[in-house]
A protein has these predicted regions:
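Conserved acidic donor-binding segment of nucleotide-sugar-dependent glycosyltransferases
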Residues: 285, 295-309, 316-323
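A short, well-ordered alpha-helix in the C-terminal region of glycosyltransferases
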Residues: 231, 310, 317, 324-338, ...
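Aromatic "clamp/platform" in nucleotide-sugar-dependent glycosyltransferases that forms part
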Residues: 244, 263
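Short His-centered aromatic/hydrophobic patch
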Residues: 90-96, 114
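A conserved mid-protein helix/loop that constitutes part of the nucleotide-sugar donor-binding site
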Residues: 13-21, 97-98, 181, 185-204, ...
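Short hydrophobic beta-strand element within catalytic cores of glycosyltransferases
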Residues: 280-284
Length: 370
């Protein structure tokens, strides 16, 4: 089988990681696997691919957004026509829409995977209007949470299947025996991830927890604003923003408490990674994902979304009680290992990939194809 995976970039994000896992898995099964990155300008990847997987960058072009998008759709269509895959699997809302447009009339099986919260992510009116229209032309919709499926209109729910992200990190973190409690967070430095809220929460308890530090790993457009916030609050000697790590092990070993401060999510990979390594974890109860991962207080602490005071109290409670940290960390690791084992998740993807083509062709041209 020839499979084409289409995604936005080739960086360190959650979608990139899942595509990498699936591409390596299907290639090992003997499939001819291609990865097309619509917004990448070079084929350099954060996650290593097997040599048998062909990775292409389709980015570049005009600085005018509408022309740039049109050019990428045209390049994508040319590659899909040339490759003539048995199946196309795309990731992320805008990429899904572009894949549907590029595939028109080619008679291809399409599986669209939503990786973010399409109700709250920043999209202009045209993208928001096109999303449900594009979804109607897919064979299957892969969602990550029950909340995401429940947000679909009835006509699309029948096409939806829930496949969570897998745990791939096999690492037992190094336990620190010192007196400093290290709080950490990881993600793109943008508004979605809510690091401004986390810094405010840290500032709220910094005076009563003098031996506590905060490290936020990642890069993004909010770096300058976050650095200014840290300076304004007088926390420059206790809050660090060291950038992106080369591997999860680097940040796993840099903390005792993990915090997910997002305003919204699709499904937080980083929370799974933290919990699987035994880090006591706290998360805002934002849509979507955290409440399905932290489904009981025994495995983690869930606080009302964007509630800075409650977040500060949760951090302070874990910082003051090493025994509780260790208990929650151990219980969380066992819970996510049982629910998000990689072989189980890969089997769910294999079931979707192996599904026969739907009886009704997706596009007019497909009705006459043989």
């Amino acid at each position: 089988m020839r499979i084409v995976f289409v995604l936005s970039g080739l960086g360190a994000g959650g979608a990139e990681k899942v595509v990498n896992i699936l591409a390596r898995h299907r290639s090992a099964r003997g499939d001819d696997v291609h990865v097309l990155a619509l917004n990448a300008e070079t084929p350099e990847t954060y996650f290593a691919y097997d040599r048998s997987v062909r990775v292409e960058a389709l980015g570049g072009g005009s600085s005018v957004p509408v022309f740039r998008t049109a050019a990428r759709i045209a390049r994508l269509r040319a590659r899909l026509r040339a490759l003539s895959p048995d199946l196309v699997i795309s990731f992320l809302t805008k990429v899904n829409i572009m894949v549907v447009l590029a595939s028109r009339g080619l008679g291809l099986r399409l599986v669209l995977s939503e990786r973010n919260n399409f109700n709250t992510q920043d999209m202009n009116g045209l993208w928001r209007l096109a999303r449900p229209l594009a979804a109607r032309l897919a064979e299957r919709l892969v969602m990550q949470t029950t909340e995401a499926v429940n947000s679909l209109p009835p006509a699309l729910k029948a096409k939806a299947v829930i496949i969570p992200n897998p745990i791939t990190l096999q690492h037992v973190r190094d336990k620190q025996s010192g007196t400093v409690t290290r709080v950490l967070a990881v993600g793109r430095l943008d508004r979605q991830k809510g690091f401004d809220l986390l810094i405010d929460a840290f500032a709220d308890i910094a005076g009563r927890a003098p031996n506590m530090t905060l490290t936020i790993f990642g890069e993004g457009p909010e770096r300058s604003a976050l650095e200014e916030q840290v300076r304004r609050l007088g926390l420059s000697n206790r809050v660090r923003l060291p950038g992106t790590t080369k591997s999860p092990v680097e940040w796993i070993n840099a903390g005792d408490i993990f915090v997910l401060s997002s305003r919204f999510e699709g499904f937080p990979n980083v929370l799974l990674e933290a919990m699987s390594a035994g880090l006591a974890s706290i998360a805002f109860d934002c849509p979507w994902g955290p409440s399905e991962i932290i489904d009981t207080p025994a495995v983690g602490m869930l606080v009302p979304k964007e509630d800075i005071r409650r977040l500060a109290d949760a951090i302070a409670r874990l910082a003051a009680d090493a025994t509780l940290r260790h208990q929650i960390g151990a219980m969380g690791a066992r819970a996510v290992a049982a629910r998000y084992a990689i072989q189980s998740v890969l089997q769910q993807w294999d079931d979707v990939i192996a599904a026969p083509e739907v009886a009704q062709a997706l596009y007019p041209a497909a009705r006459v194809s043989t």
